[in-house]
Structure formats: C-alpha cells, structure tokens
C-alpha cells in the first residue's frame, strides 16, 4: 500500500544555540518521507520529559545526543518499521511502551518526539496534505495571535532585568499577516528607542533585545513607548504578555522569590501576588506565564484568585504540558491557561490530549517554541491543527523564530477566505473588557 514505515533515519544536528539536537527521517514504502528536528529549553521544568544527553564533557561539552540517535536506530526503528504511518496514536503508544518510564528517560523525549513528528509529516505527505490539514482535519483554519518576544531578561540574558520575557500581542489585528507587520513595526521602533537611550540592541536566544535596563518596570515602559511611537494604542491594538519564569527566582528553602538580577529584594508568595496585581493595574498586560514558581501551588492559587478573571495566567513549568499536572491545576482552580511545548511531553498524541483536557476545562492553550530552536516549522502547522489560537515563537528576528511565522503566513494564504484570526477573542478564559 505504500503507507507503512520502511525505514527510520536519525542524525545529530545543531540548534540555534550551537548545541546538538536530534533530527529524524521517517521513510515510507513508496519513498515518501517526513523530517523533524526537536528543540530544547534553557529554563526547564523539574517535571519535564527527559532530554537524553550523552554527558561526555570532551564532546560538545557533554551535550551530545548520540545515545538518543542510537535509541532511534536500535530500539525504536526495528519496532516501528512495517507499522502504518497513518496511525499516529499507535506509533506514539508503541514508543511509550518501549520506553516505559513516566519521564521518557530510557529512550529520551528528544528521540521519541523526533520520530513522532516525522511520522505525522510523512503521513501528511503520503496523503497529499499539509501537516496542519492532516493533524487538524476540517477544523484547521484558525491562525494564532502571536506572542512576540521583544525584551529578554533573567536566564535568557546578561542584564539587570529579573523577568525572562516581555512580549507583545497584536490583539487588534484583522489577519495574521497584519499581526506580524504590527509586531515588526514595534520591534524596529523599540530598537530605535533603545539605541537612542544608549542601550545595546544585540538580541538574546529568542531574538528579543537584552538591554541593560535599570529596572523591571523600565522594560514595560519602553515597550509602551514603542507601541505608541509605532502608531498603535497599548492595550487595544497591542497588549503586553509576560513570562517572568519565576521558578528561576524562587528559593524552595526560604519559600521566597529573590529578585536576584536587580534589587536582590526577597518577596513572599503573597508579596509576589501583590506585585503582579499592581503591574496588571499599571500596564496593559493581558497574559502572565509562570507568574509563580512550579513548586508554589499555594501561591499559584492565590494569584489565580486575585487576578485570574482579569488576565490569562499560563502554566508552563507548573504543568509541563502534562495531563496529570494539568488535571491537578484544574481541580485546584489554579491558572487558566497551559503552555504547550511538544518536547516537554514527547509525543504528538499526548500533546493533543493535553490541549483537549485544557479546552474542556475552559483553559486556553498556547503552542510554544523553546529557546534552543531549529529551522523546523512543525509547531506552526501544529497550532493551526490544534486551533488553540495562540503561538509563542520568539521575536521578529533570527531565522529559527521567523521560520515559524513565515510558515503561518503561507498557511494563511493557502486557507484564503476560510482563514480566521481571532485577536483578543482567543482569551476566552478571562472576562472580556
């Protein structure tokens, strides 16, 4: 029939930070093939699926992925060869069975995910479909509102800003292409403003600027200045989204949040909640990701009770794209949104299950890149297939980020009049003003 898996190849390639990562090719009997490369994160959740690294310090500083490659060639490939590529669930379940650990530490989530994504791409190609059409069927027509990273701090930079990502969301755009234009205009305007203030305009891992600003507040203020100067209204045309990555600031021993890159101030959970409540009043913020640490479930509950009806509260390190943690969050009434990172969980099937659970509970879902990316654009197709309406894939610079935006522009063009861009209405988990 031609749609059975004939061969699986795997290789070590380089990601956007110069570290090795896994790429896999799934080749079908008729010669059709799908190729996928996996990303990796800088700030990682303690409960994330395990990214298998070789640990040999004399090669790639211990970050080689040859063990994961060997696992694909020697363990995964012999079991999957001969299976139908059109049965994604069976393929993914077989790999989970072969691994047999909760965090995929035996075979490596990087090995499993590369094969999972490559299989879907091969199946789509075999059927003459785009990956978004194959994975999303008739529902795949919603283009996402992008979260564009424009200022980096914390673990993603070398400056005195505590919070990892300051992003803009073009919520007032009518189409995805217009959203990208608006974001790009603000990005270039911000560059001019930073340069005029004597700040460096070099970019961080995800393509945002990493200037040595004087405070966390200054980051919000220069972004608002850039939005206005570019001709847009903050909060109406373009809103701010944050990823403070507070797990990086949290000391589990003292249960305090330490603003270690700026004032060295120590805040209790209650004080951190008040901090965010003030910021939401002061700035046009629509979304905060990881506003509290992944171990601080009580703090998360307080934050959700305080501002969860005003803005989107996204669990990333908290949920690690895992249905068991998401279930706990839903039961406790913690957060109202989940960040979806395919490599945090390791298969497309589990990713779909997490999004399904979130939607049923009234939580939003955001498909996300990682700080170590490649030219692979699978997540662009995935966000349209899942219909989550939001994507987080970096700034308006660096090809590893732009590749995803360009793929979405192509998808929007291909969908023609059926393409929808929902802008602000994607935030169904909060009260709309």
UniProtKB/Swiss-Prot annotation:
Highest taxon, organism lineage: Bacteria
GO cellular component: cell surface; extracellular region; phosphopyruvate hydratase complex
Keyword Ribosomal protein: no
Protein residues bound to (2R)-2-phosphoglycerate: 164, 341, 370-371, 392
The UniProt record lists the keyword Transferase: no
Annotated catalysed reactions: (2R)-2-phosphoglycerate = phosphoenolpyruvate + H2O
Cofactor binding: number and manner: Binds a second Mg(2+) ion via substrate during catalysis.
Keywords assigned by UniProt, alphabetized: Cytoplasm, Glycolysis, Lyase, Magnesium, Metal-binding, Secreted
Cofactor: Mg(2+)
InterPro entries documented for this protein: Enolase, Enolase-like_C_sf, Enolase-like_N, Enolase_C, Enolase_CS, Enolase_N
Signal peptide positions on this chain: none
UniProt binding sites for Mg(2+): 243, 289, 316
Pathway it works in: Carbohydrate degradation; glycolysis; pyruvate from D-glyceraldehyde 3-phosphate: step 4/5
Locations listed in the record: Cytoplasm; Secreted; Cell surface
GO molecular function terms attached to this record: magnesium ion binding; phosphopyruvate hydratase activity
List of catalytic residues: 206, 341
Annotated SUPFAM superfamilies: Enolase C-terminal domain-like, Enolase N-terminal domain-like
Family that this chain belongs to: Belongs to the enolase family.
Functional summary from the UniProt entry: Catalyzes the reversible conversion of 2-phosphoglycerate (2-PG) into phosphoenolpyruvate (PEP). It is essential for the degradation of carbohydrates via glycolysis.
Protein name, per record: Enolase
């Amino acid at each position: 029939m031609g749609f059975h898996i004939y061969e699986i190849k795997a290789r070590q390639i380089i990601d956007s930070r110069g570290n090795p990562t896994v790429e896999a090719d799934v080749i079908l009997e008729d010669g059709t093939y799908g190729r996928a490369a996996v990303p990796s994160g800088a700030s990682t959740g303690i409960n994330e699926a395990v990214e298998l690294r070789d640990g040999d310090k004399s090669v790639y500083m211990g970050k080689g992925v040859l063990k994961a490659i060997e696992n694909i060639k020697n363990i995964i490939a012999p079991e999957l060869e001969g299976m139908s590529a059109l049965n994604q669930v069976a393929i993914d379940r077989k790999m989970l069975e072969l691994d047999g650990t909760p965090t995929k530490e035996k075979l490596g989530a990087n090995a499993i995910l590369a094969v999972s994504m490559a299989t879907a791409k091969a199946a789509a190609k075999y059927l003459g479909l785009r990956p978004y059409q194959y994975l999303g069927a008739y529902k795949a027509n919603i283009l996402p509102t992008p979260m564009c990273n424009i200022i980096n701090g914390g673990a993603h930079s070398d400056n005195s800003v505590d919070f990892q990502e300051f992003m803009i969301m073009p919520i007032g755009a009518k189409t995805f292409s217009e959203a990208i234009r608006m974001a790009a205009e603000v990005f270039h305007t911000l560059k001019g403003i930073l340069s005029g203030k004597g700040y460096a305009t070099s970019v961080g891992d995800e393509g945002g600027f990493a200037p040595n600003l004087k405070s966390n507040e200054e980051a919000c203020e220069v972004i608002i200045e850039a939005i206005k100067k570019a001709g847009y209204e903050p909060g109406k045309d373009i809103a701010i989204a944050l990823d403070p990555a507070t797990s990086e600031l949290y000391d589990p021993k003292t249960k305090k949040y330490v603003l270690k890159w700026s004032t060295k101030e120590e805040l209790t959970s209650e004080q951190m909640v008040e901090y965010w409540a003030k910021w939401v009043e002061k700035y046009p913020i629509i979304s905060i990701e990881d506003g509290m640490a992944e171990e601080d479930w009580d703090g998360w509950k307080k934050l959700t009770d305080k501002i969860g009806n005003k803005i989107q509260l996204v669990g990333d390190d908290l949920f690690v794209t895992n249905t068991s943690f998401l279930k706990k969050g839903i039961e406790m009434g913690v957060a109202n949104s989940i960040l979806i990172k395919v490599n945090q969980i390791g298969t497309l099937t589990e990713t779909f299950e997490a999004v399904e659970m979130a939607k049923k509970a009234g939580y939003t879902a955001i498909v996300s890149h990682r700080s170590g990316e490649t030219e692979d654009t699978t997540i662009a197709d995935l966000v349209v297939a899942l219909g989550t309406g939001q994507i987080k894939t970096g700034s308006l610079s660096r090809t590893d980020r732009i590749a995803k935006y360009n793929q979405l522009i192509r998808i929007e063009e291909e969908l023609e009049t059926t393409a929808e861009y929902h802008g602000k209405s994607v935030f169904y988990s909060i009260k709309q003003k």
